[in-house]
């Protein structure tokens, strides 16, 4: 592993010297590029975008006595769906009328199977795995969204949730703090 890390740093140094411009998705990624040896004047930030018009008009979910939580994630280890399932287990023990919707495809069949088995072991009766869906359409059913990833850049699911006026709870990865709290000055 150390060999690969050294190779990465060496490669980064050479590429940064040759690069005309280095573009990052968020402020902290730019800072890391500079720490790795890129000249600050070469670095810029161009964040992801979403079609705001597609999400801003989505109505809030009508009050029905249930709290509906959505996670727009692929079933892959990096999305840490197991932690989400354990958290939902804890929440379900404290609150009766809560549902979790895990929206997204399967990237890793073995991991998906482990998630389904864990959900069964935890007896999560108000859990849904609808698979890939039209997120803009499905957001109508959700009160808020959650992201438990262990690594991210600038997650589109958070941007889409915010555009649809849905609160979002995230792990502190990528630029989630920057999205939720605002970019540092």
Predicted regions: what they are:
Residues 1-23:
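A conserved, positively charged/aromatic
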Residues 28, 49:
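Carbohydrate-associated surface elements
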Residues 50, 72, 99-113:
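Glycosyltransferase donor-sugar binding loop
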Residues 71, 76-90, 110-113:
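A conserved mid-protein helix/loop that constitutes part of the nucleotide-sugar donor-binding site
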Residues 113-132:
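Nucleotide-activated donor-binding/catalytic signature segment of Leloir-type glycosyltransferases, i.e.
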Residues 150:
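Aromatic "clamp/platform" in nucleotide-sugar-dependent glycosyltransferases that forms part
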Residues 167-170:
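Short hydrophobic beta-strand element within catalytic cores of glycosyltransferases
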Residues 173-185:
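Short acidic/histidine- and often glycine-rich active-site loop of Leloir-type glycosyltransferases
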